[in-house]
Amino acid sequence: SVVAVFIAGGNAWYGITPGTLVVMFTYTYTVTNQFNFINNGLQKMNRAFGDASGMTQVLDEPRLVADLPGAPDLRVSNGEIDFRDIGFWYTDGSATTRVFEDFNLHIAPGERVGLVGMSGAGKTTLTKLLLRLSDIQEGSILVDGQDIARCTQQSLRRQIAYVPQESLLFHRTIAENIAYGRPNATPEEIREAARLANALEFIERLPEGFDTITGERGVKLSGGQRQRVSIARALLADCPVLVLDEATSALDSESEQLVQDALSTLMRGRTCIVVAHRLSTVASLDRIVVLDDGRIVEDGPHSELVAQGGEYANLWERQTGAYLE
């Protein structure tokens, strides 16, 4: 457009002053920029509409796990857990994979139970069923005698503290991430939870202390630091049931010891389910359940399972270099 104006005005050059020509170029440049601005805005708007359409489709998807109408809240006083004759399978296209069939497991109140076995044995799936991230097709899962399928999911998950292998931290301060376990906690309670989780020392070394922003998914903290913040959150929540899913498997030796000490504090007085590949993590627990293809093949304390010379003893021997006791 600038070139067009220049050519059109060239024939009458004798009537145009340099100032007028500058003004013409300036106006043309300004108008062109405005059109470019409008064009960019329309492109962004079209992308936003496309993204919104995709999100709407996701939000409109029916919930696979839904509460029954008028479902009561789950109330837990002891933490007794019963998996009774459960059956669970999933379908991928025309293929159906059965994970559990007539599976039974009883965990007494306050008992600490380790789940071990080869990858794909069903360890993590069992914890997800307890958290009701999926519904079983057969049988029932009871917590203190209450069928979790008949209680609200929100009340169920308020009773279970969950510490995964990869800590789930938000792009907020350390204090806010810990307080996610109990939003109305006081600063003193947050600090005490951090102390019990062996996190206070590294937090106080940070320039902003508890006000330090952790970054997206906690990228500004090391793996051991993220895990201790996650444990502090679970301590603050003070739930009667605790689920640990490979909570120390990705840590170095020094961080693992600090996290292991914090977990020992966290497990006191709670019903605990500990999923582990590293058997040293579960050797001190009350019971160890060995799973294979969705079935319990061995069940007992560490010393008994080692003495039996079965699957657990073989796993222990491979991990410890034949040091059995």
PLM segments and residue spans:
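A hydrophobic transmembrane-helix motif
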Residues: 1-28, 81
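An intracellular "coupling" helix at the cytosolic face of ABC transporter transmembrane type-1 domains
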Residues: 1-2, 40, 44-47, 63-64, ...
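Alpha-helical transmembrane segments of polytopic integral membrane proteins
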Residues: 4-5, 35, 52, 200
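Conserved catalytic core of two-component sensor histidine kinases
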Residues: 25, 32, 157
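Cytosolic ends of transmembrane helices, especially the final helix of ABC transmembrane type-1 domains
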Residues: 30-58
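Conserved E/DxxT/N motif and adjacent residues on the DHp alpha2 helix
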Residues: 57, 64, 179
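ABC-type nucleotide-binding domain
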Residues: 74-325
